[in-house]
């Protein structure tokens, strides 16, 4: 919002986080965020506070951007949203619009309005569609801006906040706006699960998933996005949003079996990847596996519901020692050691697995890796390596969506 020229006050209950942001330090990794934060601090149009009385009074718009995690039963835990709504109510200026950015179930806009308890305050839904790793660019160049409010005048007031953006605007009612975010994420998860199942089919029939997906992507009805097979999907949104949408459907008596199968397919993908990795090491108990990538995707340090960690946990449960590297993310577990380079992870390893698609991994010279490994073999679950190059360097290579090579023709170098 500061990038769009607005005066912004940010409120958070975490004193340490607020202090860090005041000092110009972003407490997480996001491309471009450090520069943007410090520029707006210098321009004095962005400030941070832990006090309601400092941040809320006088604001024309108040955004609620609180966590919305899954409850044990699969529904959305609304405690943070409820607490925030109750807290801000007495401090809101007459005529202000409260805008919910959090991904929350249908009906939450009405819930927030009821908790605020004031007829002179409007509440709107304005879901975010930011991707970790490209969040700033996504905000400034959105595909669409979705605004759900009870009246056209409220919709227009919120839309004016984004008037400098070149984007399509979807002005609708709150319930529809709330549903849009869930449906979008559920569809993307569905697409990924489908592609991973197709990749397994390719392995079974001897096809190559890369060519299949490329041909699919050239079809204008399908397009090229979200057609890359991998170790599964995860992150801060897809798992909780697919679960939440299933819960929402059940609450209104809608049979959404397809979405449940999407979730189940993803769990099977974690198992398939781990099982294939285990089959590539001679002695499961006591083997040593190197892992490149811990974050749920490249461009972030976020490991929430990371497919990489799902696979790592399965390997650890099988008694395999795992040595991991990631340029931004970190992880800790019994039997797991994190090191500070790709080469360090590969030392004495029986297998190298690529689990996150960091671009730097594709530039690694395999000749700097093979001599240090106990068994030079690689399993590329993200299809980021030039496997012909790695094979020429003496590696046995396998990849998601590609039939495993015949052991008799393997290029493995005996050690």
Could you tell me what each predicted segment is?
Residues 1-415:
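Structural/interface elements that position substrates and couple domains in central-metabolism enzymes
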